[in-house]
Design a protein with these regions (language model features):
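Low-complexity, polar-biased intrinsically disordered regions enriched in Pro/Ser/Thr/Gly
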Residues: 186-192, 218-225
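Short, structured loop/turn "capping" segments at alpha-beta junctions
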Residues: 216-219, 271-273
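Cleavable N-terminal export/targeting peptides
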Residues: 1-26
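Outer membrane beta-barrel
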Residues: 27-54, 58-181, 198-216, 222-227, ...
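Outer-membrane beta-barrel pore domains
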Residues: 2-4, 28, 32, 57-58, ...
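Interfacial loop-to-helix transition and helix-capping segments at the boundaries
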Residues: 195-199, 252
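Acidic/polar active-site rim loop that often engages polyanionic ligands
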Residues: 16-17, 134-140, 187-188
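Solvent-exposed loop segments that connect transmembrane elements
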Residues: 53-59, 183-194, 246-249, 287-288
């Protein structure tokens, strides 16, 4: 497709504007034309009171926890060659989160290779730092994501992505190691050690998204724009790996797909309302039926335009359901409020959550969390 130079400049400007919302504050040192290094820090800390989670198994817990601590590093060699290296605290040690070379040929065509998120649903591409609800992660419905991958949903591989049609149509397609779905199956090395023989096939993943209102340029996404944009978007994503599900005594193909929707509308002088919804279908080739089935999620929020003290108030609601082939459903309801001080760089959230697994009684928890990025 031929794109005029003026359109390319507009797309680049839009990409810069978008990255200002879903990027940490950070610090950048320039040492030549299009040459720079950047560094940043992100952290989330929380207090949780959960039903029956005390050591005696019957009282409420009272726990402070460092949920996440990240170091962000970026570098630019020239206009076209860049890289990222990010780390994450996993509760015991610092691990590599992202490590990828980035070749920015044009807004319509980019190549990233290394350890990174593979194409998937909006929730996974946004991650816990950039989702509606301050650290919220839809782990009931989005089964492959924060709990999957080599670490925090990441995998080793390469992806081609871009934004065409004036930035309104985003695409991404890639090949990855896979077999790290977080569903109880064996990884390639674990299967080899257990004597489970299988072909060494790759996992293929792709995503296609169309923005009817404002464009959303870039690869990693945002779950909620906090009133900064008017968004009406629908996305479709899928993954497939031949013999991607390995257990002792059995193996099968892995396949999943999802459809997700986001609508966010600003009302001048008042605020912005947002609604999100997603549908998921997971297929483990009948090897792990507890992770094979359908899932659903939905969310609603409203952010007020006027500040209250330092920041803006954003109440939100979430609902999730996973219906596996074992018919042991899991449902979760969340209600809370965010206090947005500086976009995703400074937020305080309070959330009540209720989770119900079929055949057991429901359990609730209350969480207060602080998120900071520098």
């Amino acid at each position: 497709m031929h794109v005029k130079q003026g359109s390319k400049k507009l797309l680049l400007a839009a990409a810069v504007a978008a990255s200002s919302l879903n990027a940490h504050a950070g610090a950048t040192i320039n040492f030549g034309e299009d040459k720079s290094v950047s560094v940043g820090l992100g952290m989330r800390y929380s207090f949780t009171s959960a039903e029956d989670a005390a050591p005696n198994g019957k009282d409420r817990s009272s726990d402070f926890n460092l949920d996440s601590a990240r170091l962000y590093f970026g570098a630019s060699l020239n206009k076209y060659i860049k890289g990222m290296f990010n780390t994450e605290w996993d509760g015991d040690q610092i691990r590599v989160l992202d490590a990828a070379g980035q070749f920015a040929i044009s807004p319509e065509f980019n190549i990233w290779a290394g350890r990174l998120l593979s194409p998937s649903d909006r929730a996974n591409m946004a991650g816990a730092y950039y989702s509606m609800g301050g650290g919220y992660w839809p782990g009931v419905a989005s089964r492959y994501g924060y709990n999957g991958g080599i670490f925090r949903g990441r995998d080793d591989g390469a992806v081609v992505w871009g934004n065409v049609a004036d930035g309104k149509l985003g695409y991404s397609i890639g090949a990855f190691e896979g077999r790290t779905f977080g569903i109880g199956s064996l990884t390639q090395s674990q299967a080899k050690n257990a004597g489970v023989k299988s072909t060494d096939s790759l996992m293929y993943a792709a995503r296609l998204q169309y923005d009817f209102w404002d464009a959303e340029p870039g690869y990693y996404g945002t779950g909620n724009y906090l009133g900064a944009k008017d968004i009406l978007a629908i996305g479709v994503a899928g993954r497939y790996q031949k013999k991607g599900v390995l257990v002792v005594g059995d193996k099968g193909d892995y396949a999943s797909y999802n459809v997700d929707f986001l609508m966010e509308k600003r009302f001048k002088g008042s605020g912005a309302v947002a609604f999100e919804a997603a549908y998921y279908d997971y297929d483990t080739d009948d090897v792990i039926e507890s992770e094979q089935g359908k899932a659903y999620s939905a969310g609603l929020s409203y952010i007020f335009e006027q500040n209250v003290g330092w920041g803006r108030v954003q109440p939100f609601l979430h609902w999730q359901r996973f219906n596996p082939d074992t018919n042991i459903d899991t449902k979760q309801y969340d209600a809370g409020v965010n206090y947005v001080i500086d976009g995703y760089n400074a937020q305080i959230s309070a959330m009540y959550s209720n989770t119900k697994v079929e055949g057991t009684r429901s359990l609730d928890k209350f969480v207060v969390a602080v998120q900071l990025q520098f």
